[in-house]
Amino acid sequence: MIPRVIEAKYIKDYILFIRFSDGSEGEVDFEQEIEGEIFEPLRDIPYFKNFNVNQELHTVVWPNGADFAPEFLYEKLQVLA
């Protein structure tokens, strides 16, 4: 089953708290993942904070259309102890 992002909150820097539909939750640090033309605007922290959870794509999306596959986010998830 493909994981679905159901909630995301800004934590700090390039870190988001993400909750998945299967109950998994934790933090994802995007700092090393922001590469390429579509992701370049995300280097600006105020812009990075301006995301939403797209209910059709089931992932985090920014205004310019940049997104990360939910499977990728699931793999990068750092579960909080």
Predicted features along the sequence, with ranges:
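Motif-centric detector for short Cys/His coordination patterns
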Residues: 1-81
